[in-house]
């Protein structure tokens, strides 16, 4: 790897020492951040091509602000004051015999695990703690990680009352869909059940945050796309039985977020409700416990379907969608074109309508939003319907992908996955 000084001498020798310090700081940051080096180097090259030092200085300041913002956002994605352990009961018994004490332990009967939350001292080292536990139990029979945070994504292009495309107008739907009683799980923010869209809906809720008034915009929107029974804005499956796990909390500093703990507890509850699919319209960083929980969900014969993310074409993979046990959904508009802010990558499985989608708005009325979150319900409903006649998720997915319309490069691609969803 080239040294910072070599990079500066080779590429930025015309810049005076003041600006060289700024460039050196940026490159130094990039060299210790996997996947960022080339991006920063390219951006610096563009900056240096500007005609005047004044413009260079302003561009450098903007780039520095952007990088600092990214660092701040990443820090907010983790609760560093405690760490998590998840394993089967016999592992916890073994750890207890070796002197490990866990204050908050939850039984996850649906998943078959115990989940412990442990206060983390200032000197906490995740890698050392994980290695110590593995040494005691003789292998990786436990998952150890931090409590990462996840977001539902900011709705893009929120429009006025009754704007946008009604979900039922975007795809050719089978005639039996309006009468099917599908058991569908949702992991999201809370649902405004007082909305007219849910006047006759079957919605069972369970809250996994302590907030007495959790946010409800996103959950209300997703639930209505699936199961609204308002004649003027019918959902895809108005007779579906929804089991809504409310996992989002809200603070002034962090905004709306869901923790790893709340997600795992929600998955556990939904398994006990005998749902066939779980709609997960949120995204965030990878987490070992969440990955294991989702693998167990799949072992139980339940299919998790998640949003690919709204970070843009150059963004890193988002989770849980990027896990192999999860169906990753991207969004398209009403002409089949890819949503401009959608993530891309090899993990993308299938595309569905997700641009300018009409949905119920918490507090009353309707609005329209765009994002991969709003595409997930289409795939969720299609999968739930197919699972009624074929209970094996792998076989059902083969059929679902085979029926998709290939709208990108031939075969599976990083923009549309297997193609645009079609109901069979």
What is the predicted role of each segment?
Residues 40, 173-184, 190-203, 210-260, ...:
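Subtilisin-like serine protease catalytic core
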Residues 68-73, 267, 274-282, 288, ...:
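C-terminal subdomain of the subtilisin-like protease fold in secreted/lumenal serine endopeptidases
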Residues 174-179, 256-277, 288-304, 314-328, ...:
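Mature extracellular/periplasmic domains of secretome proteins
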Residues 40-153, 277:
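Inhibitory N-terminal propeptides of secreted protease zymogens
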Residues 21-30:
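Bacterial N-terminal signal peptides
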Residues 110-115, 124-200, 415, 424:
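Protease zymogen maturation seam
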Residues 226, 245-247, 354-424:
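Hydrolase catalytic cores
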Residues 187, 192-198, 203-205, 331-373, ...:
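Catalytic-core environment of secreted peptidases
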